[in-house]
Amino acid sequence: MKSEKCKVPKERTRRRCDVLPDTLHFALLTFHFSLALILLATASASAQLAPEIGYVYPSGGRAGTTVDVVLGGYDWTPDMQLFVHDPRIKLELIGPASPVLVAEPPYWFGFKARGPAWPLPREFAARLTIPADVPPGLIRWQVANANGASPPESFQVGIAPEIVEDSKRKTAQILPALPVTVAGQIRRIEEIDHYQFKVPKAGPVTIQLVARQLNSPLHAMLKVRDAEGRVVLDAADSEGRDLTLTMIAQADVPYEISLHDLDFAGDRSYVYRLTLTAGPHIRASYVAAGTRGKTHPVEFVGLGLATGSDKLESVFHDVTFPAAPDVNSLAYVLETPWGNALPFTLGVSDLWETVQPPSKESPLAVPGGRTSFIDTRFGSDQHLVTLKKGETWRIVAHARAIGSPLDLELTIFGADGKQLATTDDVPGTTDPELAFAVPADGAYRIVVTDRSGKSGSRAANYRLSVEPQREDVTLTMPTQLGIPLGTQGKLVIKAVRTGGFKGPIPLAFDRLPEGVTTAAELVIPADKNDLTIDLTCAADAPTNAALCRLTATPKIGEQIVTRPVGTILLATTMKARIKLTPEGLDDVRKVHRGSTFLAPILIERLEGYTGPITLEMTAKQQRHRQGLASEEFVVPPEALRVEYPIFVPEWMETTKTSRMILNGAVKVADPKGNVRTLLQRQELRIGILPEGALMKLSHTAGELTVAPGSEIRIPLALSRAAEFRAPVQIELIADETQTGLVAAAPITLTPEQADGALVVRLGNDPRLNGEQSFTIRAVGLKDGRWPVIAETTVLVTVRPGS
């Protein structure tokens, strides 16, 4: 069920602007002028506008299926190229772009309205084809156009049959038999999604919510109630790690899930995947990793694993770990009488792996790995090791890496109790790691401490690994790079050497975009930790992109090894053809609410371009609030100044300034004759301060209760400012749940008329039953062209027999 509560802003009066003293006025003018010059220079330096991925909806699919999806893109053009990192999967555009989309009401008012604006996407229809041999998990993808390449984002390949949320429903959506995955979207603020499910057999049911891993802004609040309304599950993803929860369900009892954002926020980008399975969820395992090629008895811990009861239980299974040297994990599926658990990831290690004994006093043989848990909240564990002088050991406490909620700290003490080393988080994770150079032969104490407060349960484990610090190298590079035609791109490769490795590091690309070349030999010199690769793009190259893989082949010891550096999307781009600047630089203009503001824009044409320009809203706005919007506007050839129409809704607050930033799109042929769309972001911003409206529409119908199939006569009153005397048409605006079920003939009020009545006819359809909110809109044209709009809302309860 979709539920939302619209907030209607109260009328606000304009604040009086006091006259400033001349000296202060001059100082402020000087400051603003200087700031404008700084912003102008900054904007000029960063004018290239590369695309970004917003979302995929539905956000994935099951292996062996083809799914029609919607791609939400920020600053996309019609000529996008799509790249999936798994070459088995096909993602293709099948339809044109939507207009730039502004988030629908309700809007934030008051303090929250001062927060950052959601990006404005365009949506593209696309088709996702996932072959049957693709394993479940996250799949990375990127996009590119003639303006650059995007960072990678992800969609998910699932394990269960999939359905899409019914966004038009009025009650909880009934889910089919488990397992099932629901692709959903919290599309508006204050929205709550509701789902209902049953199981034919009592036992554990696992609910998995994936959103943050899809780059969704959703911090989920999830609650499950039984048929009597009792809460049986309540969880909040305040840390942004997504949710996997287990409850004990009774047979044939309807349970209802409610799901919303922690802050009751919502937008098209708030996508999620909700998977329900009849079966338990493994929360921890002992061991967390097994020795390569060996069979270990593994204790699995989770709710109801042994008896199906509502308590933490454990079961033992023998697990044989893969022997292949390039396999580092095993997705293990535990079978239980209540259904299979979700796949659980076990590590595959080259160390001998053990579980810390109950006494927790036995020494750890090194090199080795040990899985344990901490007895108390914020507690510590101690591990005794014997080390020799001159050795260097790599010591890691794994928690986040194995799915544990713990946040660990690692400390080493000598035999005399003196602290020798300590570490907390390392880049990219909350797991601690250190390289310990042993100062003397003897016994050492490794202390693992939890800082999260989530220790004290066997469901929160960790793995300690101690192994010699071997010679090796880890390399990193950016995930995307744009190279303008006829120039050089600079790609910086970073190397982290460990274990004393100092040798040269040869590098090689598997491919490059057409027209892009680099040196025949790419090598990070011995003892150096970085290399800048010059990527030269020919002036006559096409604008194109390619997903390129970089591999390193250093000689470590006596063996040449292969180390993947990563994948980068390289895009050849074209120079800007225009520069847009608002007349008056960063001025703020007063604009009547509910009217169209004609914003003056200055155009500088570059590289000899004289053709038409399409102006549109840029995706990343600043102070863009409460439905401020504009449509595409075509600037004729040769024009150097235009007035761009921006509609300022009547509900915008008069106490806050708003901003609008534009893109200019032009079509230009590249050297190979391919027509590409170049996108240029406006320098500085258009400033708007809403003031009193030119027109206001109200009604005297009150709150009505009517029967299905009836007619409603709604008395209306229209107030106008003296300077606005145009005819006004009044009409009913049906929302997506009312379309085809309600109708009303529009009425027109002449400049002399101040009231009228709209007759609304209801269909005899049960889908209308309940509370309905009807929007009535009045539209007039200022100067015969520019819309002036006012709205009012009528609350109607549709009840059979009324």
What residue spans do the PLM features occupy?
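Intrinsic disorder/low-complexity segments
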Residues: 1-47
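Short, surface-exposed loop/turn segments at beta-strand-coil junctions that are enriched for proline
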Residues: 129-135, 248-252, 264, 319-326, ...
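Ser/Thr/Pro-rich low-complexity tracts
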Residues: 48-187, 258-375, 449-456, 460-461, ...
